[in-house]
């Protein structure tokens, strides 16, 4: 795309774009020619590329190339059947017609054939040969030259054929042969040029690479197929992987890819060995064994689990063992590299490898087949795609067919088999029934292989693949099913507390026999709960019964029978033992007599029942025993485990060490002490007295028709009282967890030394230790250091004598500061103040600190010295009191001497200066300086010197005379004013000068006295600039750098060096790693149009960012040397810089790539410090980082060696899956991605290429995984690996990652999202972090290294700030506690670093089943933990992360996370963790994953339970009876219980961890002020609103499914959202629920009789009204310009238009209410039976309003004369509903029949209906005493009923449509939406009347910006003023 910059007005050169219906049509002006080629014509792209390249040189040859391309396109697709082919041919033909005449005119030779031939010869001789024979050939240029020559020869042959020229000159044929051979050799490569031409490359000269390549090349003793044998003899460079390809039919590029992969792995492990291998260029067996053990650990475990012997059989001969091991590893990686989506099924890969490795062994051992009697041959082999076609594709087809049954996420999980189901088939020995070669009739293939019967080809119905060990059923029962031990524990504890409370037992009496007997009834409850779990095991997993084995069925039946037996035995024994059991029952149980001396039968039964729990307790206390038993093959242990849990491959032996167990057990025991003390004393015990009182009330006067008027004990009232309390009891552990984790995280963070350096002042105080810290942690050392906590961190001070160490510090520090300047965080002046001299002056005997530490020290020292009158030692002591002042004084003095020595060259002058300096230093050494020198003139001397330095800095030759005068002045000041005694030598020299007749320092042209201007070297310029700063900066540099982000980064980085981290190894010895970034189609780089585009307020992105980042904008202008924005826009280069500047402040791929490429920059710098000698280090890294052309070409230069090491250790792959399509369609993003590759040569892009290929006359799509890099401003293909089908068949993001995973390298892999950023100073610590893989972290080595993130989007608005704080606390304090002590950290986002080999052999770094793995990342953590991994968390390194900044984007994000958690609740992974963890770790797992969402749901349910309970009490009349009873008895506790309930809003607790983390890192005063500001900015409103989002989407996902990936905006949000948009977004999740709660509160206010004056009542009602207000109005509070009158008017018009608009096919939801309404209930169409049942059941609650309120009406008082209220009243009230329905139906039918043609008739109909309604209401007023109050109450009664009917109708949609009522339902729904819209909109409108509300809201919303002096009003009100 180098030629892609052709502008629109480029005239005839560009092809004009034609409009087309198809989005995939392939042509665009910007990137035509060689890039935009239809998918089916990919092979002609190189020809068009060559044409574009040579066009300026030989237009005719370019024309002939295009003509040949046109012919070839016609040959490939004669009928133009491929997509976009016809348009492409047309445009190409038009171009040919246009260019023909002009190119013919410029032809040099007579014929076209001669023209091409002469150009070919010229190109070959003058370019190709010249390049090839050069001393230092550029490999990339050579490769490209050979490819071009190959294309030209192809064109030459075609032209000769058309001109019927038969003979081609022999020298051309010879050249073509040479080109063809070299083309194969100079193939594009990724990191290592593993062909014969690449041997001279620097990376191939590394000893470890040589060793690995040599080991792969050892093909001794292998038999090659005949075709390969000839090739091998000819080239001699085939290796072991080529042999595997020949035998098993792998793809060529797969082999090339895995060859490099294997070489990198071997080289990496080989160089790290200790002791070092001898010789270094021979691959050590230890390196091979290390890689092999990692690669095959899972495979060996799998074989052991299935009781099979593994196939890794080694030969007897020692010399062949290494070769055999490499063959096995190569085979596995080749299988993995071609497995595509099957990589998500690791045990399926184990099965394939098991059989192929067995065949490999047979091949090499010469085994004979038992069946055929011949030598064993591979079952699948032959051509290059045999393995893909015969092994992978059949399995892929099964996976694809099952995925298609998912119906795009709409089908139930039980209807199809996901990746896990299919993989788990290979956890059973049944998988071997597939055989090898695999039989098509094996179980796995039943779903797709229909077997033909008979000649007519009738089909047998396909068998079902079926679910495996688990079925994801949509039900809330999963919450109990997955965490049954937790709920059992809570229920038993609750039962025990209730027993103690009602028995009024004091805690000290708990060991009384009768109390213990009463408490022992909990075991009966436990037995029933266990029975429930056994039943759920069968019911929830029943859809997978096809795959159940007999042992599974037996186990389930036995468990149900045994648990049922206990449910009978325990109650019977208990009843027989207790005294209060009925006498008849005791007689009936007389067959259970007690024998004397034997304990009671119940006690024995309980002991027997608890026996298995004793065993479990022993295994809990000794986790090592549990691990051993779970991994054991002993049958007794298998039987034991078979009963307690099904035997599955994962989840075994994952228990932690004894110490870890003790830590998290203590955490939970302390938490439970607090939780149960609170629950018992403040919840359960307080309700005992009110409960007894309520149950003792008789004679309740009911206000409605009571169905059970004579029922005793008022159970309804008791339930209303207890239900909210019990719900809070189940939820409040989450609150206690928040408190305890905050305290625990704070303590751990403090011990981790977080926040020790948090301000610039703290940094200054610790700066002297910094060089030591740098050299300890960032510079490798041979000394080993013990890790661990110490109270103080001390580092050996780097003294001036240790110059190399000081130089290393300066290189690292300066590179960090330079990166700050590049990012525009600091200005040029600040950079100068922060830099340390790159090249230290050998004459200085001290460390040169950065000037910002020494600023203003010299002026202060001068003032001090000028006024000092006492002894020298006192003055020096005062100066030395400030270490930096001492350094500044010494450095300035030494620099003063250095300047004079450099400047003065006259003999006499040099002697004079020497005498003065000698005199000064002599006096200093004798402590007599102050007595012999006057100090008062010192400032005058200094000012002269400052002037001199200023002149030297600019080095203007015209100022020579001024320099002479200054030197004379300075000499005079010293000799006349300062020296008290005359120096004899000076006098003599003065006399000598008089005699010569010239003045001092003046000199002559022949004999100058001074050298001015001095010789300008970089070192001289640096020294003079620094000296000038030290002398002139008078103000303190306390606030340097001024930028807050720069301050934060420096503070965190320096603080992290005082934390505990591993020492860094040398770069060559470090673990190599890759970074993988999934990218779909988000923003890459903002275009110029994006920058200039204004929103509705006239604000452009550039203007916005100028106001948000004013200091960075100023620094940017300074860097470009521009005055303002106008001058920036004058140059194309500056516009590009501006685009980059803006893109680096958004969430773009450009920002992410820049951040990740810091890794490479850091590695090169660190490798320089490792590899450079002392001279090179003292000369500085700058000399290397700006190499000469010679250095770049030389393979021996230090520069190329650094490049080689960086290449080997770091790979960055951006997986841009749509790049191919974007390129073909001319999408700007493709050009941006190419530019990224050009600017970052080591960046690789992986994409999925869809190519149309013709097979058997049919065009079909073929998919490839392609890896590309940039060469010579074009993208160049490195590998192209064919896939069995489309890569995306499940969740898109994990499958995008998966396809690119094969192109990553190294032993660690970092997953980075494209909204992340990185910093150079953090990248420097990557080596340290990777060493954590080798550190001791408990029983198991780490498999995922987690670390913290900094949220960089928090500075814009209050919302962004809340979100930023919330996210920051989660990724720091939250995950710190999860990792230690709780040991349940998983994988939550994307800075985590994976143990790559561990994960690629166990299913990858995410899971991809549609729907269930919506939160794909956390499943990587689940999978890692279940497969005995270990996830850690580290605080000393961080990356940047962007978050959504507008309320709607935040809500979309939270909806996505809530849906993901809903799916997790149903998942097998969580079920297995819940059952395989020990009890306390299971508690941790629950409360840190789905437990938070369940607790949030319980909070909302508590509010509902409380209010509906109150509604029941008030409407039924029970509450009035209770209040009267309490008043009569004087029972205050009963009154209080009625008035208050424990209603807690969990959202407010989100601030706890935030406050702790801010306190730790920025000080507790800051934390407190931030907390207060957050409250003032309505943070509680935001968190309460978020609670509603979480609960709605979590609950809906579990009930109905329909979860999907929700793309959230990543843009800059200062945008007003329209009311209609907010309504669509929040109607169902917040507004409906808020309205319902509001109606409940109003009803209770009207009918309630509880004590309204109590504080408890006020608190509860206040908090509930706050919840309602938050849910209804938060979207308006947090909407920019939400209360601006004009916007309100526009919003209302827009909403009216939207709600009135009719829907229809193709009408989007944002244009029509009908379309939106249909979309909103779509989930009900696909919901299961239970989902629909619960939806209807929950809707029934709305009927209680009508039932209760109709009996309160004035109208019905007549019917209340009797003792009982008649049910007829309620029945008659339904007539109103029926009447309304009839009216609606009449209107609906009338509209259909009359509205179009008989408008008058329709109006008359509506008039009659209106008159009729008025007449009926009037009669009711007159005859039945109806009042206005009755009408208002009726609305409260009937509106909820109508809503209930509407909800039920939506569920019963098919029925409604059948009976013809759907139109009425729609009309009713629209009416309700109108009412809801008006109710919500009215208060907003009223507030908008007052202008100050809008101003207040803006201030509230953008306070963060205001505090930094920003003017958001101008941004909102219009940047138009700027124009």
Swiss-Prot record:
Could you tell me the keywords of this UniProt record?
Answer: Cell membrane, Cell shape, Cell wall biogenesis/degradation, Glycoprotein, Glycosyltransferase, Membrane, Transferase, Transmembrane, Transmembrane helix
Topological domains (Cytoplasmic): residue ranges? 1-481, 543-559, 623-658, 741-1486, 1557-1566, 1652-1657, 1756-1766, 1825, 1895-1923
Membrane topology is:
Multi-pass membrane protein
Which positions are glycosylated? 1710
Instruction: Give the knockout phenotype.
Output: Plants develop deformed and inviable pollen grains which do not have exin.
Region feature Disordered, mapped onto this chain: 1-22
Catalysed reactions, semicolon-separated: [(1->3)-beta-D-glucosyl](n) + UDP-alpha-D-glucose = [(1->3)-beta-D-glucosyl](n+1) + UDP + H(+)
EC number(s) reported in the record: 2.4.1.34
Give the source's domain of life in one word.
Eukaryota
> Polar residues bias: where?
1-10
Q: Where in the cell is it found?
A: Cell membrane
Could you tell me the Gene Ontology terms of the biological process aspect for this record? (1->3)-beta-D-glucan biosynthetic process; cell wall organization; microsporogenesis; pollen development; pollen germination; pollen tube growth; pollen wall assembly; regulation of cell shape
Q: Which InterPro entries match?
A: FKS1-like_dom1, Glyco_trans_48_dom, Vta1/CALS_N, Vta1/CALS_N_sf
One GO CC annotation: plasma membrane
Recall the GO molecular function terms of this protein's record.
1,3-beta-D-glucan synthase activity
Membrane spanning residue stretches: 482-502, 522-542, 560-580, 602-622, 659-679, 720-740, 1487-1507, 1536-1556, 1567-1587, 1631-1651, 1658-1678, 1733-1755, 1767-1787, 1804-1824, 1826-1846, 1874-1894
Q: Which top EC class is named for this enzyme in its record? A: transferase
Q: Which residues lie on this side of the membrane: Extracellular?
A: 503-521, 581-601, 680-719, 1508-1535, 1588-1630, 1679-1732, 1788-1803, 1847-1873
State what this protein does.
Required for the formation of the callose wall separating the tetraspores (interstitial wall) and surrounding the pollen mother cells (peripheral wall). Required for exine formation on pollen wall. May be involved in callose synthesis during pollen tube growth. During plant growth and development, callose is found as a transitory component of the cell plate in dividing cells, is a major component of pollen mother cell walls and pollen tubes, and is found as a structural component of plasmodesmatal canals.
**What's the family?**
Belongs to the glycosyltransferase 48 family.
List the protein's name. Answer: Callose synthase 5
**Gene name?**
CALS5
């Amino acid at each position: 795309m180098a030629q892609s910059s052709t502008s629109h007005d480029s005239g005839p050169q560009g092809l004009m774009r034609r409009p087309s219906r198809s989005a995939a049509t392939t042509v665009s002006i910007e990137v035509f020619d060689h890039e935009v080629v239809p998918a089916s014509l990919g092979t002609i792209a190189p020809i068009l590329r060559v044409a574009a390249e040579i066009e300026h040189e030989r237009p005719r040859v370019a024309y002939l190339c295009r003509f040949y391309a046109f012919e070839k396109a016609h040959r490939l697709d004669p009928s133009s059947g491929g997509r976009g082919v016809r348009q492409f041919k047309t445009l190409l033909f038009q171009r040919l017609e246009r260019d023909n005449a002009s190119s013919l005119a410029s032809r040099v030779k007579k014929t076209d054939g001669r023209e091409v031939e002469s150009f070919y010869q010229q190109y070959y001789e003058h370019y190709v040969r010249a390049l090839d024979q050069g001393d230092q050939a550029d490999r990339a240029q050579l490769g490209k030259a050979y490819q071009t020559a190959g294309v030209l020869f192809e064109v030459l042959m075609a032209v000769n054929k058309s001109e019927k020229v038969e003979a081609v000159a022999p020298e051309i044929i010879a050249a073509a042969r040479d080109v063809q051979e070299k083309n194969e050799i100079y193939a594009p490569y990724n990191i290592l040029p593993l062909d014969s031409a690449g041997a001279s490359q620097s990376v191939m000269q590394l000893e470890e690479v040589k060793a690995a390549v040599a080991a792969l090349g050892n093909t001794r003793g292998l038999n090659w197929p005949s075709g390969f044998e000839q090739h091998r003899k000819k080239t001699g460079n085939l290796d072991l992987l080529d042999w595997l390809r020949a035998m098993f039919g792998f793809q060529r590029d797969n082999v090339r890819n895995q060859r490099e992969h294997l070489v990198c792995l071997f080289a990496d492990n080989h160089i790290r060995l200790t002791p070092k291998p001898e010789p270094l260029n021979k691959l050590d067996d230890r390196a091979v064994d290390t890689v092999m053990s990692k690669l095959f650990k899972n495979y060996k475990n799998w074989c052991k689990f299935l009781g099979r012997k593994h196939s890794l059989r080694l030969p007897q001969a020692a010399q062949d063992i290494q070769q055999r091991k490499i063959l096995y590893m190569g085979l596995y990686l080749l299988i993995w590299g071609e497995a595509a989506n099957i990589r998500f099924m690791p045990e399926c890969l184990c099965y394939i490898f098991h059989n192929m490795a067995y065949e490999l062994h047979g091949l090499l051992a010469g085994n004979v087949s038992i069946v055929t009697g011949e030598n064993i041959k591979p079952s699948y082999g032959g051509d290059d795609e045999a393995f893909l076609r015969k092994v992978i594709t059949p399995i892929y087809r099964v996976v694809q067919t099952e995925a298609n049954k998912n119906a795009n996420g709409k089908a139930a999980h039980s209807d199809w088999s996901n990746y896990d189901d299919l993989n788990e088939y290979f956890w059973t020995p049944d998988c071997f029934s597939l055989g090898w070669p695999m039989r098509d009739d094996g179980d796995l293939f039943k779903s797709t292989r229909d077997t033909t019967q008979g000649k007519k080809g009738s089909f047998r119905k396909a068998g079902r693949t079926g679910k495996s060990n688990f079925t994801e059923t949509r039900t809330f029962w999963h919450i109990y099913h997955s965490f049954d031990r937790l709920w059992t524990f809570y229920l038993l504890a609750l039962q025990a507390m209730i027993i103690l409370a009602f028995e009024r037992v004091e805690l000290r009496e708990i060991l009384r026999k009768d109390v213990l007997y009463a408490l022992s009834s909990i075991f009966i409850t436990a037995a029933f709960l266990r029975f429930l779990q056994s039943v759920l095991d069968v019911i929830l997993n029943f859809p997978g019964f096809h795959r159940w084995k007999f042992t599974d069925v037996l186990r389930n039946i036995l468990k149900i029978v045994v648990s049922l037996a206990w449910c009978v035995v325990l109650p019977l024994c208990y009843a027989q033992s207790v005294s209060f059991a009925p006498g008849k029952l005791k007689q009936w149980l007389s067959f259970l007599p007690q024998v004397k001396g034997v304990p009671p039968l119940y006690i024995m039964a309980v002991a027997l029942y608890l026996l298995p729990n004793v065993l479990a307790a022993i295994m809990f206390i000794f986790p090592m025993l549990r691990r051993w038993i779970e991994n054991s093959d002993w049958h007794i242990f298998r039987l034991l485990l078979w009963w307690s849990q099904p035997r599955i491959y994962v989840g075994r032996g994952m228990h932690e060490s004894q110490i870890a167990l003790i830590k998290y057990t203590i955490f939970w025991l302390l938490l439970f002490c607090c939780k149960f003390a609170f629950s018992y004393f403040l919840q359960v015990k307080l309700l005992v007295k009110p409960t007894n009182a309520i149950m003792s009330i008789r004679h309740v006067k009911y206000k409605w028709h009571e169905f059970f008027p004579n029922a005793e004990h008022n159970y309804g009232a008791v339930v209303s009282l207890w239900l909210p309390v019990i719900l809070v009891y189940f939820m409040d552990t989450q609150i206690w967890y928040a408190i305890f984790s905050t305290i625990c995280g704070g303590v751990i963070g403090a011990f981790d030394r977080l926040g020790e350096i948090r301000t610039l002042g703290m940094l200054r105080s610790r700066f002297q230790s910094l060089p030591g810290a740098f050299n300890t942690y960032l510079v490798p050392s041979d000394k080993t250091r013990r890790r661990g906590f110490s109270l103080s961190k001390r580092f050996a001070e780097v003294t001036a004598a240790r110059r190399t160490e000081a130089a290393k510090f300066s290189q690292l520090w300066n590179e960090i500061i330079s990166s700050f300047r590049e990012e525009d965080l600091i200005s040029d002046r600040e950079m100068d103040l922060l830099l340390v001299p790159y090249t230290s002056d050998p004459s200085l005997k001290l460390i040169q600190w950065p000037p910002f530490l020494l600023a203003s020290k010299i002026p202060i020292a001068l003032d001090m010295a000028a006024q000092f009158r006492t002894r020298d030692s006192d003055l020096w002591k005062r100066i030395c009191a400030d270490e930096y002042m001492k350094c500044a004084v010494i450095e300035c003095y030494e620099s003063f001497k250095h300047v004079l020595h450099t400047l003065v060259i006259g003999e006499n002058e040099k002697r004079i200066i020497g005498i003065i300096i000698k005199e000064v230093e002599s006096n200093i050494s004798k402590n007599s300086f102050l007595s012999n020198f006057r100090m008062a003139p010192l400032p005058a001397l200094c000012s002269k010197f400052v002037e001199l330095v200023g002149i030297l800095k600019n080095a203007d030759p015209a100022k020579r005379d001024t320099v002479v005068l200054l030197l004379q002045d300075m000499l005079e000041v010293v000799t006349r004013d300062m020296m008290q005694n005359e120096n004899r030598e000076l006098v003599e020299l003065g006399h000598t000068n008089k005699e010569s007749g010239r003045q001092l320092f003046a000199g002559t042209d022949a004999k100058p006295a001074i050298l001015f201007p001095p010789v300008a070297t970089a070192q001289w310029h640096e020294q003079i600039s620094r000296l000038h700063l030290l002398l002139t900066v008078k103000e303190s540099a306390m606030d340097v750098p001024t930028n807050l982000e720069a301050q934060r980064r420096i503070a965190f980085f320096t603080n992290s060096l005082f934390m505990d981290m591993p020492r860094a190894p040398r770069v060559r010895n470090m673990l190599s790693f890759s970074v993988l970034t999934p990218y779909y189609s988000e923003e890459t780089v903002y275009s110029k149009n994006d920058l200039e585009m204004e929103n509705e307020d006239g604000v452009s992105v550039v203007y916005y960012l100028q106001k948000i980042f004013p200091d960075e904008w100023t620094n940017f202008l300074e860097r470009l040397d521009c005055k303002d924005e106008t001058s920036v826009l004058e140059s194309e280069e500056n516009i590009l810089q501006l685009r980059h500047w803006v893109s680096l402040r958004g969430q773009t791929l450009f920002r992410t790539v820049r951040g990740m490429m810091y890794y490479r920059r850091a590695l090169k710098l660190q490798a320089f410090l490792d590899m450079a000698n002392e001279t090179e280090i003292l000369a500085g890294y700058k000399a290397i980082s700006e190499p000469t052309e010679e250095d770049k070409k030389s393979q021996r230069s230090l520069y190329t060696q650094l490049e080689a090491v960086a290449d080997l250790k770091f790979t960055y792959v951006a997986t841009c899956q749509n790049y191919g399509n974007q390129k073909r369609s001319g999408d700007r993003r493709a050009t941006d991605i190419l530019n990224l590759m050009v600017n970052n040569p080591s960046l690789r892009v992986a994409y999925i290429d869809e190519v149309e290929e013709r097979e058997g006359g049919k065009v079909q799509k073929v998919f490839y995984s392609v890896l590309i890099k940039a060469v010579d401003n074009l993208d160049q293909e490195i590998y192209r690996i064919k896939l069995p089908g489309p890569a995306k068949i499940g969740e898109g993001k994990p499958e995008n990652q998966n396809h690119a995973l094969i192109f990553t390298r190294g032993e660690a892999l970092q997953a980075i999202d494209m909204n992340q950023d990185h910093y150079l100073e953090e990248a420097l610590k990557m080596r340290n972090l990777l060493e954590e893989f080798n550190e001791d972290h408990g029983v198991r080595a780490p498999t995922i290294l987690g670390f913290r993130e900094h949220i960089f989007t928090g500075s814009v608005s209050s919302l962004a700030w809340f979100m930023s704080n919330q996210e920051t606390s989660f990724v720091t304090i939250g995950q710190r506690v999860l990792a230690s002590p709780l040991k349940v950290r998983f994988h939550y986002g994307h800075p985590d670093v994976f143990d790559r080999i561990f994960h690629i052999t166990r299913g990858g770094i995410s899971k991809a089943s549609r729907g269930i793995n919506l939160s794909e990342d956390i499943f990587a953590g689940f999978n890692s933990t279940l497969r005995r991994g270990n996830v850690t968390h580290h605080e000393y390194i961080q990356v940047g992360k962007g978050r959504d900044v507008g309320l709607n984007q935040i809500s979309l994000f939270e909806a996505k996370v809530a849906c993901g958690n809903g799916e997790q609740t149903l998942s097998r992974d969580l079920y297995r963790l819940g059952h395989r963890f020990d009890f306390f770790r299971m508690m941790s797992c629950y409360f840190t994953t789905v437990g938070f969402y369940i607790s949030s749901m319980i909070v909302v349910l508590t509010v509902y339970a409380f209010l509906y309970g109150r509604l029941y009490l008030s409407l039924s009349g029970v509450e009035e009876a209770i209040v009267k009873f309490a008043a009569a008895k004087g029972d205050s506790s009963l009154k209080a219980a009625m008035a208050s309930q424990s209603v807690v809003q969990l959202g407010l607790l989100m601030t706890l961890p935030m406050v702790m983390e801010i306190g730790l890192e920025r000080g507790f005063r800051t934390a407190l002020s931030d907390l207060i500001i957050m409250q003032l900015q309505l943070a509680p409103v935001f968190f309460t609103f978020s609670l509603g989002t979480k609960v709605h989407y979590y609950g809906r996902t579990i009930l109905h499914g329909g979860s999907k990936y929700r793309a959230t905006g990543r843009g800059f949000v200062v945008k007003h959202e329209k009311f209609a948009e907010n309504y669509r977004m929040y109607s169902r999740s917040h507004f409906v629920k808020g309205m319902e709660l509001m109606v409940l509160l109003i009803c209770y206010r009207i009918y309630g009789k509880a004590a309204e004056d109590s504080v408890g009542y006020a608190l509860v009602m206040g908090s509930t009204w706050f919840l309602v207000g938050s849910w209804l109005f938060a979207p308006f509070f947090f909407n920019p310009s939400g209360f601006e009158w004009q916007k309100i008017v526009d919003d209302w018009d827009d909403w009216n238009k939207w709600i009135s608009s009719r829907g229809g096919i193709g009408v989007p939801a944002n244009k029509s209410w009908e379309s939106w309404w249909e979309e909103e209930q779509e989930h009900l169409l696909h919901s299961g039976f239970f989902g629909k049942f619960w939806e209807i059941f929950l809707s029934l609650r709305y009927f209680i309003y009508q039932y209760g309120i109709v009996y309160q009406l004035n109208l019905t008082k007549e019917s209340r004369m009797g003792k009982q209220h008649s049910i007829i009243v309620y029945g008659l009230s339904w007539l109103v509903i029926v009447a309304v329905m009839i009216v609606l139906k009449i209107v609906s039918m009338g509209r259909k029949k009359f509205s179009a043609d008989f408008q008058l008739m329709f109006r008359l109909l509506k008039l009659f209906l209106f008159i009729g309604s008025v007449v009926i209401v009037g009669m009711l007023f007159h005859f039945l005493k109806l009042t206005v109050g009755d009408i208002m109450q009726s609305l409260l009664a009937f509106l909820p009923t109508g809503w209930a009917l509407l909800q039920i109708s939506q569920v019963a949609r098919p029925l409604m449509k059948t009976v013809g009522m759907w139109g009425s339902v729609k009309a009713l729904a629209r009416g309700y939406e109108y009412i809801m819209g008006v109710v919500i909109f009215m208060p907003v409108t009223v507030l908008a009347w007052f202008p100050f509300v809008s101003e207040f809201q803006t201030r509230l919303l953008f306070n963060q910006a205001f505090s930094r002096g920003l003017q958001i009003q101008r941004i909102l009100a219009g940047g138009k003023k700027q124009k």
